């Protein structure tokens, strides 16, 4: 791949300004449309990487990741009950490093049924060592009609700051479009990469119209 092709691909993904800013040592931030709050566009995912035991050989590198995230003016860390021990590890390490309050913590509900969803989410609060979670999302749209009612209530009461939905397959885009059209959401996490760009055509304009931040999750 030559330089021209590389720059074209970065521009198509909206990453060229980010790369330019990194070279100039500037901190780029993007606005959450529903609130005006600003976040850095790059965060830390925890699938597999934070699913570790108590061995210091596994945990020490992750402490370095959290330190670097904060040192570089980042804050977003994304997890899920689906990710094994990741929530527990994030909670323990960030507390040990006195960084928990500096993180923008996002996690998800990944189960069926109202009461089971409430139980699972409350467990996430405990594992992440938080009284308030920044972003709670419905993982892969699982039982989304039920969980969305709970999330709305929790947002109104201040238990969570933002709510959203996630998925990784283009086959769900029609359902996501209907959800966005009929339900106020703060965040949408969806697959988007050089190999999967349909979200830019179908979902991003609608998310922008409905003031939902597009939290793009590369698939490569």
Question: Where is each model-derived feature located?
Answer:
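Beta/alpha (TIM)-barrel catalytic core signal, keyed to glycine-rich beta->alpha loops juxtaposed to Asp/Glu
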Residues: 141-220
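N-terminal binding-site loop/beta-alpha segment at the start of enzyme catalytic domains
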Residues: 2-103
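CE4/NodB-like, metal-dependent polysaccharide N-deacetylase domain
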Residues: 118-137, 153, 157
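Conserved residues at the C-terminal ends of beta-strands
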Residues: 45, 80-83, 136-139, 166, ...
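Structural motif corresponding to the early beta-alpha repeats
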Residues: 81, 97-116, 140
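Short, acidic/polar
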Residues: 56-68, 114-127, 171-178
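Structural preference for beta-strand elements that scaffold enzyme active sites
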Residues: 41-43, 76, 102-106, 132-135, ...
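Generic structural signal for well-ordered alpha-helices
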Residues: 29, 66, 87, 91, ...
């Amino acid at each position: 791949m030559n330089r021209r092709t590389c720059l074209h691909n970065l521009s198509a993904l909206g990453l060229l300004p980010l790369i330019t800013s990194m070279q100039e040592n500037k901190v780029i931030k993007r606005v959450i449309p529903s609130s005006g709050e600003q976040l850095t566009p790059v965060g830390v995912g925890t699938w597999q990487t934070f699913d570790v035991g108590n061995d210091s050989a596994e945990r020490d590198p992750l402490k370095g990741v959290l330190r670097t995230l904060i040192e570089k003016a980042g804050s977003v860390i994304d997890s899920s009950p689906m990710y094994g021990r990741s929530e527990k590890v994030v909670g323990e390490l960030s507390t040990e490093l006195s960084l928990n309050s500096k993180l923008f913590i996002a996690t998800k509900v990944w189960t069926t049924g109202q009461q089971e969803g409430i139980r699972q989410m409350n467990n996430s609060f405990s594992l992440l060592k938080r009284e308030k979670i920044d972003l709670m999302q419905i993982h892969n749209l699982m039982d989304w009609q039920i969980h969305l009612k709970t999330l709305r209530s929790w947002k109104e009461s201040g238990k969570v700051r933002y709510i959203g939905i996630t998925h990784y397959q283009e086959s769900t885009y029609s359902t996501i479009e209907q959800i966005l059209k009929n339900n106020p959401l703060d965040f949408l996490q969806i697959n988007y990469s050089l190999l999967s760009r349909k979200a830019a055509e179908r979902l991003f304009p609608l998310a922008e119209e409905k003031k939902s931040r597009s939290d793009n999750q590369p698939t490569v």
